[in-house]
C-alpha cells in the first residue's frame, strides 16, 4: 500500500484514535505497526477476531488487561545473566498475573456457553507460571523492596540492624537530653552522615565527645561528630548492612535465574497478551465510532450502507449508501466544490483501508466490502515547492504513477480530476484518464466540477453519475449522495437568494445554450424525483419499523399472558398436590392403624377394601396433577419435522404449522396471523406416537417395605398359603403392579386349585393363567391385576 495513499486518506489519524484504546505499550506497538492486509483469508479472520472481541465487550463491558508491561528487555537481560532489580521482577510478576487473568476471563466465558473460537485459540497459548509469579510477589513488596520474609537469613540480619539502630539512638538521645547538651550541641537531634549516626556539636566543644568528625556546617560552627561511645555500634551496624545487601542480591539473583529458565514461555505469553491488547483495542474503537463488521467478499464489489467517515462526529455527519462494482465500476461525482464530494471520496477510501486492517467500519449491518491489492488516491492540493511544480503538475505526476500501476485489483480515487488547467483541456484529459483506468478493470470513484463529465456517465455502460445534494433554501450542501443524478452548479439559484436582480440572472441565462438549459432542467427534475423517492422510502421504512414494533409488542404480550397463565396453573397445581398429598398421608396412617387393629382381631376389614378407599382418594386428585403426569410420561422422542407439520410452540403454548426450515435449528412457523422463526428445541410435534407401557418398579410408593414380583408358596400349609395370597395381592395392588406370579408347584394340585379358586373371587384380579414354558409352566399362576 502506497505511503502517500495512507497519508491523504488520513489512515494514521485513525491509528492515533485506535492507540487511545490500548492498555499497554505492547498493544501500542502493534497499532503503530498496523498496515492494511491484501490477503483475503487473513482479512476475513481479522474481522472475525475483532467481532469476537466486540462480543466480549458487549457482554462484559471490559477486559482485564491491567498490569501488563513490555518486559521483553528484562527477560533478555535475565537470559544473559544480569541481575534484575526488584522493580523489574515485579513488572514480570504483574505481567504473569495479567496473562493468567486474561486466560481465565476468556475461559470462564467459554465455559458459560459463549462461543469464542478464535480468542480461545489465543488464550490456549498462555502458559500459567503461577509458582514463579507467587515466589516473586512473596519476596518483593508492592513498593519494590525485598521483604523480610524473603529468607530466614534476611529476617535475622534485619533484626540485628533494628537492634543496633535502637541501641545507637538510645545512647545518642541520652546525650542530647543531658544537662550539658544545650550548651555543647547546636541542636538536640540525632542525624546521619555517611550512613553513620552523628550529633551536631558546636566547634568549641569538639573534644568533649571524642570520636570521628564526619561533616561540618557551611559556616563551620557545627561539627557532625560520631561519639566514641557508639563507634563500635556503628561499625556493627555497617557490617550488618553489608550482609543485608549481600543477602538481598542473592535473593534477586535467585529469582532472576528462575525467570531465565522460563524465559521462552514468558516471551510467548507476552506476545499473546500483546495481540489480545491490540484485538480488544480494535473492538473498543469499533464501539466508540459505532462501527460494525462488514461482510468481506472476493468478488470486487462493495455495498456500504449508511457509511460515515470515522474522523467526523457521527452526530453531525450525514451517512450515505455507496455501491460500487456490481452494476457499475465507476462513480463520477459532479457538482460545485463546496458540496462535500471529497468527504464522500475519503469515506470510501478509509472504509476500505480500515476493513483490510481488521477494523470494523462505520456502516450499518450487512454492508459488504471487497479486498484490493492496491489503493491509489489523488486527493488534495500537494504542490511541491522543491520540485517547482504547479497544482496541475503535482496532480499529473501522481496520476502518471497511478496509470503505471493500476489494474483490475485496484481501487482508484480521483479528487477534482483534471483541475488546475484550461477547463476544456482538463475535462478532455479527465475523460481520457477515466477511460484508461476503467479499461484496466479498476474500481474508480472520481469527483469533478467539469460539466462535460456529466455526459460521460451516460455514454459508458460501467459508469454512473452521482452528486451531493444542495439545499438552495439554506444555501448549503446537505452532504446526501445522490447516485444516478449528476450535479449542477446552482449558481443562478444561489445568486438570486443572495439578492442578485432577476434582470441580471435572466440575461445570464441567455448566455447559456439551449441544450445546457435543457440538461440543467433535466437534472433538476431528476433531483426532485430522487428526493420524492427517498421520502417515500423513508415513510415505507417508518411503517415497517412500526409494524415490527407492534409485532414485537404482540409477541411480548402473548409471552406475558402465557407466563402468567402458567404461573397460576402451577400455583393451583402445587396447592392441589399439597392437599392430595396431605390426604394420602392421612389415609396411609389410617390404613396402617386399621391393619394393626385387624391383626389384633379388634375389627374385620379386608385389604382390598382399603385399596378401593385409597383409589377413590387418588381419583380425587386435581386434573392438573394427572395431566402433568401424562405430559411427563408422553414426552416423545424428537420427530423428523417436515413442512406442513402441526407443532406446539412451547413458549406460547399455541399450535402452529411449519412453513419452511430457515436454518439448521430454526423453522418459519405460522401461528394464527403471526409468522415467526422458532427453534426446534422450542416446539413439540403434536401427533406424538403412543408410548410403550412402563415396566413396573419393585417398590411401593409411600411405603417402607419392598414387594416382590412373585410369591413362592411351595412347602406352605394350605391355610397359611391362602392368607399369604390374600395379603400379597393387596400389597401388589397398592404398589400398582400390573402383573405378578404365584409359585405353588405341581405336586398333588391341591394348593394350585386353592389359589385359582381364590383368584376367581378376588375383585382386584383381572385374569390369570398358567405360566408359559419359560415362566414355570403348571407350577406357576400368572395374575393380571386391575
From Swiss-Prot:
InterPro entries given in the database record: DNA_mismatch_repair_MutS_C (IPR000432), DNA_mismatch_repair_MutS_core (IPR007696), DNA_mismatch_repair_MutS_sf (IPR036187), MSSS (IPR046893), MutS (IPR045076), MutS2 (IPR005747), P-loop_NTPase (IPR027417), Smr_dom (IPR002625)
Signal peptide range: none
Chain spans, region Disordered: 529-549
GO BP annotations, alphabetical order: mismatch repair; negative regulation of DNA recombination; rescue of stalled ribosome
GO molecular function: ATP binding; ATP hydrolysis activity; ATP-dependent DNA damage sensor activity; endonuclease activity; mismatched DNA binding; ribosomal large subunit binding; rRNA binding
Keyword ATP-binding: yes
Alphabetical keyword list: ATP-binding, DNA-binding, Endonuclease, Hydrolase, Nuclease, Nucleotide-binding, RNA-binding, rRNA-binding
Annotated positions binding ATP: 335-342
EC number assigned by the record: 3.1.-.-, 3.6.4.-
Domain Smr: 711-786
HAMAP family xref list: MutS2
PANTHER family membership: OS10G0509000 PROTEIN, OS10G0509000 PROTEIN-RELATED
Known partners and oligomeric status: Homodimer. Binds to stalled ribosomes, contacting rRNA.
Function: Endonuclease that is involved in the suppression of homologous recombination and thus may have a key role in the control of bacterial genetic diversity.
Similarity field: Belongs to the DNA mismatch repair MutS family. MutS2 subfamily.
Protein name: Endonuclease MutS2
Species for this entry: Bacillus mycoides (strain KBAB4)
